[in-house]
Amino acid sequence: MIKLSVSIDVSNLKGAEDFYVGALGCKKVRDQGTNMAVLCVEKSDIYLQKKEPGTKPLTSNNVARDYQRHWTPIHLDFLCDNVNEIVARILKLGGSHEGGERGDWGTIAYCTDPFGNGFCIINE
């Protein structure tokens, strides 16, 4: 059996915990050292990892971490009953709402956390 976990780099561990617990309903599982916290949503763990801006995520590349809005081909989708309620909490806790769509299939909101990481809130 394989279990999925997700790692998210952040510049402020306490702020990230507050955001993911308060806005998205994640549960705190434990601290893992001084620079990592483990959260849980349903059966998936989210590892929040404090990484300083400007540090290198890869030894083989000149890319440096920054926490401005950035795009990645992989993102998280959080499924919920009430998209508008979750978006309001995201905004209150420092995240952003970048638009969305609505149709017969449901509703989606495009959002970011305070560290530039994009994700979607979906009601199907």
Where does each model-flagged region fall?
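Vicinal oxygen chelate
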Residues: 1-5, 27-78, 87-112, 123-124
